[in-house]
Swiss-Prot record:
Its EC number is 2.1.3.-. GO terms for biological process: tRNA wobble uridine modification. Belongs to the class I-like SAM-binding methyltransferase superfamily. Cx-SAM synthase family. The gene is cmoA. This is Carboxy-S-adenosyl-L-methionine synthase. SUPFAM superfamilies: S-adenosyl-L-methionine-dependent methyltransferases. It is an enzyme of class 2 (transferase). S-adenosyl-L-methionine binds at Y40, G65, S66, S67, D90, N91, D118, I119, N133, R200. It comes from the Bacteria. It holds the Pfam family Methyltransf_25.
Length: 243
């Protein structure tokens, strides 16, 4: 899955537009997310492991906010021969087009249906696995409870939800510490202070994070029987919930 180097915010701009998953971002997304999100490769690999354990024959897998298809590919590799269907949804046509190219590079007997739509419009049913990989944080906060409840209602008993998010902390000291650790991570991956600052400005109106407590409360209120944070690095976490 090739990607150009992310240089979107490398030059000073007079005005910073809100971040969008447009063709510019789609072209560098693979590089961008691996240089920005600590543990991303581990999360993607483990999605495949979860799929191997939880995806049942003749069921569906929903990848909500599929971007370039990394999660879908990881899952698909582990569920060969189960007569399952993966539905990968993204509201960016540029992402869908590149995802289609990436999926075509690998032969599989597992059907993948790509859908360009808002994930809030998708009918979730017969699902043994649902993935929200750094997606929920871009939805309006008032829509998040409803989406998680719809996911729960559309899942099979014993199904798994994997939710990965950037998170915030009520403790100001911890928030500052982990923010600084994340900034150091980005610096170590070659991002300049200008790039870091301009991207932060682009994201501030479109990405609103929750605390881990908020995520757990939302998930348990929706009806899930089991919840755990299975991975955390700085202010990035991945959670599992089982119906």
């Amino acid at each position: 899955m090739n990607s150009k180097q992310d240089r979107i915010y490398a030059k000073p701009a007079q005005t910073i537009s809100d971040f969008q998953f447009d063709s510019r971002v789609a072209g560098v997304f693979n590089d961008m997310i691996r240089r920005s999100v600590p543990g991303y490769n581990q999360i993607i690999a483990t999605l495949g492991d979860f799929a191997r354990r939880y995806v049942t024959p003749n069921s569906k897998v929903f990848d909500l906010g599929s971007s370039l298809g990394s999660a879908t590919l990881s899952i698909r590799r582990q569920i060969e021969g189960r007569q399952c269907q993966i539905i990968a949804i993204d509201n960016s046509q540029s992402m869908i087009e590149r995802c289609e190219e990436n999926l075509a590079a690998y032969v599989s007997d597992t059907q993948v249906t790509l859908v360009c739509d808002d994930i809030r419009n998708v009918d979730i049913n017969n699902a043994s696995m649902v993935v929200l990989n750094f997606t929920l944080q871009f939805l309006p906060p008032e829509d998040r409870d409803t989406l998680i409840k719809r996911i729960y209602d559309g899942m099979l008993p014993g199904g798994i939800l994997v939710l990965s998010e950037k998170v915030k902390f009520d403790d100001a000291c911890i928030q500052t510490l982990l923010d600084e650790q994340h900034l150091d991570f980005k610096r170590a991956n070659g991002y300049s202070e200008l790039e870091i600052s301009q991207k932060r400005s682009a994201l501030e109106n479109v990405m609103r994070t929750d605390t881990l407590v908020q995520h757990q409360q939302r998930i348990t209120d929706s009806g899930f029987s089991h919840f755990s944070v299975w991975f955390q690095c700085f202010n990035f976490a991945s959670m599992v919930a089982i119906k």
